[in-house]
Amino acid sequence: MFTSIAGRAVVVTGGSRGIGKGIAAVFARNGARVLITGRSEQDLAATAEELGVSYLAADVASKADCELVAGCAADRLGGIDVLCANAGIFPDARLADMTEEDIDRVLGTNLKGTILSVQACLPLLARSGRGRVILTSSITGPITGYPGWTHYGASKAGQLGFMRTAAIELARDGITVNAVLPGNILTEGLAGLGEDYIAGMTSAIPMRKLGSVDDIGYAALFLATDEAAYITGQTIVVDGGQVLPESPEAVS
């Protein structure tokens, strides 16, 4: 039986849709007090009402906005025990055609946004005495590659470099830093890639199905428990075995 996280203060960036919404829902169902952030006030308000959580419109690529999130968490939640740095985007752009703006957008949200979010929340996480930072990375970049996502893959691999060094620096404050690496998870964004993409990816997964947002939420929940207190600088891959086969024939 895991220690309850009921009552703990949890911030989920990018929490209005997709994986972030799933993470927020899992924590809320387990009694945590949750603040979600994102750029769309409309999406945030709808999700907050559905899940019974607080929200604040903010852009993780902005240092000032990240500091507002920390201040809001202090006011509404009384602090931060868990930061789920989840905000991320994955627009398609082939390397030959990729613009400087494309690169800045993806790295700004996925990598810079992760660093700024953690940095802004550090004082509150340290004050918690059992602070947890949980990054949503990806199998794409750290383990695999996919055409059109060179900037995305670079941002996600960069998150893990940040995670490992941050885990060392923050250990003295009792803060752990870990990451969940989702494979293909059924979200609005993934559905938008089309039926052919989904069918192709499903056929490459040994479990022959896409993951759910709950699968990621429960991995994050575990890393937030007292039982995971001695785990830091590590990753949990949640992909149905997608990265395991040596060739397509291995799962045929």
Sequence positions of predicted segments:
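Active-site helix of classical SDR
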Residues: V118, S155, M163
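Substrate-binding pocket helix/loop in short-chain dehydrogenase/reductase
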Residues: R94-L95, D102-L107, L190, M201
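Short, small/polar-rich loop/turn modules that mediate ligand/substrate recognition or access, typified
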Residues: R130, A171, T176, I231-G233
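Conserved glycine-rich cofactor-binding loop
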Residues: A9, S16-G18
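Short C-terminal tail/terminal secondary-structure segment
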Residues: T232-S252
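Alpha-helical segment proximal to the catalytic Tyr-Lys
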Residues: P123, I168-E169, A229
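The beta1-alpha1 cofactor-binding region of Rossmann-like NAD(H)/NADP(H)-dependent oxidoreductases
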Residues: A58-L68, E100, D215
